[in-house]
Amino acid sequence: MSKKGKKQSKNNSSVDGNRRLAENRQARYEYEILETLETGLELLGTEVKSIRAGKVNLKDGFCLIKKDQIQLHNVHISPHNHAGKFFNHEPLRIKRLLAHRKEIEKLKISLERKGLTIIPLSLYLKGSWIKLKIGVGKGRKIHDKRDREKINDSKRDVANALKRF
C-alpha cells in the first residue's frame, strides 16, 4: 500500500498532516485563547528523542518574554532512557522558543493588557522539525467554564437527537 493510502490514528495526526506529539487540552478549558502562534524550539538531542517518544507534559507550562526572547517554563520532558546520567538533560529546563522579532513584539504588546498570558497549546512534528503552538489566553472564571459546559452539553444533545431521526 502506498504512503497516501495509509491511515493515521485519530489521536496523533491533525488536519494538516502534522504528527501531534503532545497537546494541552486543559489550556482550552482554563483559558479563552485570543490568538495563536507557531514557534520552533531550541532543544538538546536527548530532549528531541524523548519528545519523539511522546514523553512530554505541557499541562503546567507557560511562556515569558525576557530580553526579546520567548522562554518556555514548567514543561516536563522526561529524561531519555538510553542516555547515560551525565549526558541526559534536566527535565524542567527552561527552553527558548524561536519566532520572528515582529511576532515577539506583537506578543509583548498583547501581554501588556491585564490578565493575559502565553500558554503552550500543542507540540507537533512539521516535516522533521518539532513545532510548538502557543496561544495568548485570558483566564476564565468558574461561571464562564460552567456556561461553556452547558452550551457544549446542549450542542451534544441536539446532535444526538438529530442522529436518531
Curated annotation (Swiss-Prot):
Molecular function as annotated in GO: RNA binding
Subcellular location: Cytoplasm
UniProt region (Disordered), positions on chain: 1-21
Keywords assigned by UniProt, alphabetized: Cytoplasm, RNA-binding
Major localisation: cytoplasm
InterPro entries: SmpB, SsrA-bd_prot, SsrA-bd_prot_CS
Superkingdom as given in the UniProt entry: Bacteria
Swiss-Prot/TrEMBL GO biological process terms: trans-translation
PROSITE patterns membership: SSRP
Gene Ontology terms: cellular component: cytosol
Pfam families the record matches: SmpB
Similarity remark: Belongs to the SmpB family.
Record function comment: Required for rescue of stalled ribosomes mediated by trans-translation. Binds to transfer-messenger RNA (tmRNA), required for stable association of tmRNA with ribosomes. tmRNA and SmpB together mimic tRNA shape, replacing the anticodon stem-loop with SmpB. tmRNA is encoded by the ssrA gene; the 2 termini fold to resemble tRNA(Ala) and it encodes a 'tag peptide', a short internal open reading frame. During trans-translation Ala-aminoacylated tmRNA acts like a tRNA, entering the A-site of stalled ribosomes, displacing the stalled mRNA.
PANTHER family (alphabetical): SSRA-BINDING PROTEIN (PTHR30308:SF2), TMRNA-BINDING COMPONENT OF TRANS-TRANSLATION TAGGING COMPLEX (PTHR30308)
Protein name (record): SsrA-binding protein
The species this protein was found in: Prochlorococcus marinus (strain NATL2A)
Classification lineage: Bacteria, Bacillati, Cyanobacteriota, Cyanophyceae, Synechococcales
